[in-house]
Amino acid sequence: MDEKLALLRTVPLFVGLDDDELKVVGALTTEVDKPTGSELAREETFGSEFYMIIDGSVRIHRAGATLRTLGPGDFLGEIALIDHGRRTASATAETDCRLLVLGHREFHSLLDAQPDIRVHVLEALARRVRQLTPEHEV
């Protein structure tokens, strides 16, 4: 659990949560291993998982073009936690990966059960959206 807590402390959605709150989040995550070449997300398909990379690298790509490569401490799929919407890009394991996964259902049960966490996470998501779409702000 210590390694899981250490990773969760670095994820912007959870930065600032205390250890007890992080333990609640950690209890809802699942650790998974994905071999090289595994598809984590496919562009234009509906998503419901948020991935946090423990080890390995993940290539983010759209229409075959690499957008960026993510590594340990990075995360992807945070918007799927909110809206179950279509993925805006694909994600493929470039190397063997070890990940923490938080599903849509678990995320919403967390927000329902922990109002303090809900406010913190929603503020963090708003910051993330602003970072991703600065040209659309009013």
Tell me the role of every PLM-derived stretch.
Residues 5, 9-63:
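Regulatory nucleotide-sensing modules
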Residues 4, 20-24, 86-88, 104-138:
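A small-molecule sensor/coupling module
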Residues 62-65, 96, 104-107:
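Short beta-strand-to-loop transition segments that serve as allosteric relay/switch motifs
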Residues 72, 81-84:
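Short, conserved catalytic or interaction motifs in soluble domains
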Residues 30, 84-90, 96-99:
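Helix-loop-beta junctions that constitute the ligand-sensing/allosteric loops
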Residues 19, 55, 72-75, 96, ...:
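ATP/adenylate-binding site constellation spanning eukaryotic-like Ser/Thr protein kinases
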Residues 60-61, 78-79, 89-93, 109:
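Short beta-strand His + acidic residue motifs that chelate non-heme Fe in jelly-roll/DSBH
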